[in-house]
From Swiss-Prot:
Localization, UniProt: Cell projection, Cilium membrane
Gene source species: Rattus norvegicus
Role description: Transmembrane component of the tectonic-like complex, a complex localized at the transition zone of primary cilia and acting as a barrier that prevents diffusion of transmembrane proteins between the cilia and plasma membranes. Required for ciliogenesis and sonic hedgehog/SHH signaling.
Alphabetical GO biological process terms: camera-type eye development; cilium assembly; embryonic digit morphogenesis; in utero embryonic development; neuroepithelial cell differentiation; regulation of protein localization; smoothened signaling pathway; vasculature development
Disulfide bonds listed in the record: none
Stated name of the protein: Transmembrane protein 231
Keywords for the protein's UniProt record, in alphabetical order: Cell membrane, Cell projection, Cilium, Cilium biogenesis/degradation, Glycoprotein, Membrane, Transmembrane, Transmembrane helix
Glycan-linked positions: 194, 199, 221
Membrane topology qualifier: Multi-pass membrane protein
Gene that encodes the chain: Tmem231
């Protein structure tokens, strides 16, 4: 009579040995070599602990309508005109004070509630004999980030341009970019730099010196700079025409560097560890099968149906 394959079920093979046997010692060693080396490999390959991460955010930037201007004149050396929105600075200038006409406008182009660009125009009246050879200009801003930690600071854009020939207009088109010397925190409120760039209440001339202002500003770990201003210097001014500064300053999306939190570090480390662990699990599983099947270490093989193994585990 012919025989047919009617039914089948898998059989698990168990290997039994004492807890103090060579088989138990081998299994303990194999387990240790399965789980510990992946941790060492992941750690020694660097980048195991995520110390810095990045994200994108559109900053909330507003122009504070605080301006400090120094116009360098020629051909006499040391001649200049100055003006600012700080009354004390203006009083200190004496005959060098010249009040310009300033107009500004901020625009939210994508209607997301955050300003995207500043249009700044300054017209400095000049006498027919006065010639502008260079400009130093400070504009101050309120700068805020909210996606991770709440970061607030008062920052500035510093523009300095000088040319060999007298000019009639200076056109500037650049981005207000964030510069970080250290990452921000991933949570909390950071207002350490939410102080005026220029101390407008000080009666001392030293506090309005550009060298002092820029040096103190550069001591910060987080600043803004006017990036790629692309200055265009136009010549040929009419006798009674003012000197014009026309600036377009954009507030672009920034890549913010921050210190990740504990659980983010654990998640990043766990992904690296598991990806290496899977390889070790596969390798040592086959090593254990070879060792026990070929009785490299003494053990007693027992065939156990899968259903009985499940019952043993449940019991």
């Amino acid at each position: 009579m012919a025989l047919y394959h009617l039914f089948s079920h898998p059989i698990e093979r168990a290997y039994r040995a004492g807890l103090c046997s060579k088989a138990a010692l081998f299994l303990l060693l194999a387990t240790a070599l399965t789980y510990i080396p992946p941790l060492l490999v992941a750690f020694r390959s660097h980048g195991f602990w995520l110390k810095r991460s990045n994200y994108e955010e559109q900053p909330n930037v507003r122009f504070q309508h605080q301006v400090l201007l120094v116009a360098l004149l020629g051909p006499e050396p040391g001649a200049f005109l100055a003006w600012s929105t700080y009354p004390t600075f203006n009083r200190l200038q004496g005959v060098h004070l010249r009040v310009p006409l300033v107009s500004t406008r901020e625009e939210d182009r994508n209607q997301d509630g955050k300003m995207d660009v500043l249009y700044f125009k300054l017209e400095l009246p000049l006498q027919s004999t006065e010639q502008v050879l260079g400009v130093q200009l400070i504009l101050t801003f309120s700068y805020q980030l909210h996606r991770m930690s709440t970061f607030e600071m008062q920052s500035m854009a510093f523009l300095q341009s000088s040319f060999a020939v007298p000019g009639s207009q200076l056109h500037v088109n650049g981005d207000l970019r964030l510069q970080q010397k250290q990452p921000l925190s991933y949570r909390g409120l950071d207002v350490r730099y939410n102080v005026s760039v220029i101390n407008g209440t000080s009666p001392f001339a030293h506090d309005y010196d550009l060298t002092h202002i820029v040096a103190a500003y550069q001591e910060r770990n987080v600043t803004t700079v006017l990036s790629d201003p692309n200055p265009i210097w136009l010549v040929g001014r009419a006798a009674e025409a003012p000197f014009v500064i026309d600036a377009v300053i954009r507030y672009p999306v920034e890549v913010i560097s921050y210190q990740p939190g504990f659980w983010e570090m654990i998640k990043f480390a766990w992904i690296q560890y598991v990806s290496i662990l899977l390889i070790f699990l596969w390798v040592f599983e086959r090593i254990k099968i070879f060792v026990f099947q070929n009785q490299v270490v003494t053990s007693i093989p027992v065939a156990v149906p899968q259903g009985e193994i499940r019952k043993e585990h449940l019991s």
